[in-house]
Curated annotation (Swiss-Prot):
InterPro entries: Arg_biosynth_ArgJ, ArgJ-like_dom_sf, ArgJ_beta_C. GO terms for molecular function: glutamate N-acetyltransferase activity; L-glutamate N-acetyltransferase activity. Its main location: cytoplasm. It holds the Pfam family ArgJ. This is Arginine biosynthesis bifunctional protein ArgJ. Its EC number is 2.3.1.35, 2.3.1.1. The gene is argJ. Keywords: Acyltransferase, Amino-acid biosynthesis, Arginine biosynthesis, Autocatalytic cleavage, Cytoplasm, Multifunctional enzyme, Transferase. Substrate binds at T142, K168, T179, E259, N380, T385. Catalyzes two activities which are involved in the cyclic version of arginine biosynthesis: the synthesis of N-acetylglutamate from glutamate and acetyl-CoA as the acetyl donor, and of ornithine by transacetylation between N(2)-acetylornithine and glutamate. Belongs to the ArgJ family. NCBIfam families: ArgJ (TIGR00120), PRK05388.1 (NF003802). Coiled coil: none annotated. It catalyses: N(2)-acetyl-L-ornithine + L-glutamate = N-acetyl-L-glutamate + L-ornithine; L-glutamate + acetyl-CoA = N-acetyl-L-glutamate + CoA + H(+).
Length: 385
């Protein structure tokens, strides 16, 4: 997997909670054109507050991330701590603190262990290495069971460039910007005047904002995009296509790694009258505990799907025209033989294709989620104990 030119990084353990990696830094040798989208939760974490201020200029050069503690609901002190982290990282890397994007993920309401984090910040420069982004992908994990990485190579005027994305997320996932963190790094540039935010927002709306694990929107969601341009200029069309593909890859990896999940669900809503209608109904289906547990248990209980469509009160769908399929098998009013095949399909596959045809329009959208198992409860009932 190709790495973008000019980015150095590291991921290490500094003992925030246990002996797994919990601290990472990404640094570009030159300032990057940058943009980001953040959580819409009304109680954003301190790093989100500071990060919004720093990305406003459209230029970033470094990202500093800690896991195992989100620095959320920590008051003014938490904001001061995020600023101090950026300041010390800036001093270590010899860049302005406003060129540093802070991120934190983990337990809410617990002050950061600054006595551990600041010494790590001070020695950041000495730890940086090229081609080391997989370490960061590991360092940002909390309840994740695997690293989440995707990349694409794209043509540039001078040859070839790379877009490389890493993400974390397994629970408290229903992004709306946009716990989910994603950092996308590229060594390409785009034509002067290109609206980088609009490009990122479009990709996020087609991917992360179509994802739900448990319907809880994190206080820390962040998707950041940094482009240093060292491999030359690409077309907006090629860049946008590759960026969206990466975001969808990472979205599916997050859904597959949902806390306790055994099955990835890819839901297609088609025949909708609008994107808003498709989004409401798609999220209603994938957020339904009854639907998610039925898929886990291999129970083709199509009444639960009818319920999930029907409970979107402001988007009534005529029952007669509604069609529902698992794979290619029709679900609605299925006979005993089809129900048996449906149960086998659900039990024997780890990737479930669910298609809901509304037949009221021409809009089609994809959404991603996962099943709901006993292990999700085990994971979250004792998270801080």
């Amino acid at each position: 997997m190709h790495m973008p030119k000019g980015f150095l990084s590291f991921g290490i353990n500094i003992g925030i909670k246990d002996d797994t990696k919990d601290f990472g830094v990404i640094y570009s040798e030159i300032p990057c054109k940058a943009t980001a989208v953040f959580t819409k939760n009304n109680f954003p974490g301190a790093p989100v507050i500071v990060g919004k201020e720093h990305v406003r200029s459209g230029v970033l050069q470094a990202i500093v991330i800690n896991s195992k503690n989100s620095n959320v609901a920590t008051g003014e002190k938490g904001i001061q701590n995020s600023r101090e982290i950026c300041k010390i990282i800036g001093e270590s890397l010899d860049i302005k603190e406003t060129l540093v994007l802070p991120s934190s993920t983990g337990v809410i309401g617990v002050p950061l262990k600054m006595e551990i984090i600041l010494p790590a910040c001070k020695k950041a420069k000495s730890l940086l290495k090229p081609g080391n982004l997989e370490e960061v992908a590991e360092a940002i994990m909390t309840t994740d069971t695997r690293k989440k990485i995707s990349s694409r190579n794209i043509k540039t005027k001078s040859g070839q460039g790379t877009i490389y994305g890493i993400a974390k997320g397994a629970g408290m996932i229903e992004p709306n910007m946009a716990t989910m963190l994603c950092y996308i790094l590229s060594d390409v540039s785009l034509p002067e005047g290109t609206d980088l935010y609009s490009i990122l927002k479009s990709s996020v709306d087609q991917s992360f904002n179509c994802l739900t694990i448990d319907s809880d929107t994190s206080t820390s969601d962040t998707v950041a995009l940094l482009c240093n341009g060292l491999s030359g200029e690409s077309s907006v069309q090629d860049f946008s296509k590759a960026l969206t593909e990466i975001c969808i890859d990472l979205t599916k990896l997050i859904a597959t790694d949902g806390e306790g999940a055994t099955k990835l669900i890819e839901l297609t809503i088609s025949g909708a009258k609008s994107e808003a209608q498709a989004r409401k109904i798609g999220k209603s289906i994938l957020n339904s505990p009854l639907v998610k547990t039925a898929i886990y248990g291999g129970d083709p209980n199509w009444g639960r799907l009818i319920m999930a469509v029907g409970k979107v009160f402001d988007e009534p769908i005529p029952f007669e025209g509604l069609q529902i399929y698992f794979g290619t098998l029709p679900v609605k009013e299925a006979n005993p033989e089809t129900l048996k095949k449906l149960s086998e399909y659900l039990k024997n596959n780890t990737e479930i294709s669910l298609n809901v045809v509304l037949n009221v329009g021409t809009i089609s959208m994809k959404f991603w989620g996962c099943d709901f198992t006993e292990k999700y409860i085990e994971e979250n009932a004792y998270y801080t104990t």
